[in-house]
Amino acid sequence: PRAVRDSEGAGGDRDASGEICDFEEYSWLYHESWRDPDVRWLLSTVPSCMILDDHDLRDDWNSSYAWRREMTAQPWWRDRVIGAFASYFVYQHLGNLAPDELEDNSVYQALRAADSDAERERILSDFAVAADSERGASQWSFKRDFGRVRVVMLDVRASRHLDPADRRVMDSDEWEWTRRACLDADVDHLLIGSSLPAFMLPALHHVEGWNEVVARDRPDKPLTAQVGEWIRLTVDLEHWAAFRNSFDDLVGLLTEVAAGTGAARTDAAGTDVATRRGTPPASILLLGGDVHCSYLEEVELTSPQVADSPTRVHQLVMSPFRNPLQKSIRAVNRLSVRGPVPTLMRRLARAAGVREPAVRWRMACGVRVDNGGMG
């Protein structure tokens, strides 16, 4: 598109001249990525479900209110949104849905009923624009049950709430869906998938919490906020720990699941009341990616509510096919796990007013930077 070509030389994230944009170019990228023999073998032998992250649309997508305000003002943004969401819907999201969910999916049914390619293109374009600009127009999160195992896959990109005073990786509707999907599960094992790790390497976790406070847009400290925003985008501080309200909500949800608390139901008076689901699951496994390396963590929930819970909690962060990780970042990862750095970063976060979480975690295996699974 001309708007993309004209962005050359605009500077910073405004220059999209060397990037893909429309549906056709995204289709080429899927073809190029998935034709690799190793990728084809993996997808043909291992059942898969998928969830979008920033590079499905653009690097740093929805990292902050300031980022979104600048990007949505660019003349090429609409074409980018259409290409990204339309291709993701076709190539990835439809494969996440069960047959009954496909029957109930209005966009899918409209595409099947369309008489021409032009009509299908219009349907996908309208859907993509609405998915980006209208709350509730789409839901990318989904759940799957495999016997006594439930997988809950979370969209932590498209549904973000970016108000600087109350940043969250999900808006209230998406979070309520997440709670019900986890608390309604009468299962032995609960898997919660998120493109972003919930529990970062310790020092990085504390840095993200500190940065969120510093980058908060406040009239009394505009320069501090600008510097904090620059750090956030430069170092990619955009995981759960950088959205502390959501991180605390997640820890609270894990605690409820481990305690055997069921989802809220409405009584005859219209009041939400908690129900008991009974025996909590034997395990909760959080799945994450994004960070170009792999590691396994043991997670300990510290609330008295789960003092006697049998539920074991782990997080597995994995990149079966990962992008290269510079030696400098590998060194940062090593420093983030042991020695004085995590302690110093924790003190920095506490000095900024970041709350102590009701959870602890430790590295059980990793950090690995090679391709493949964790054994």
Regions found by a protein language model. Give the residues of each.
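Metal-dependent phosphoester/phosphodiester hydrolase catalytic core
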Residues: 1-375
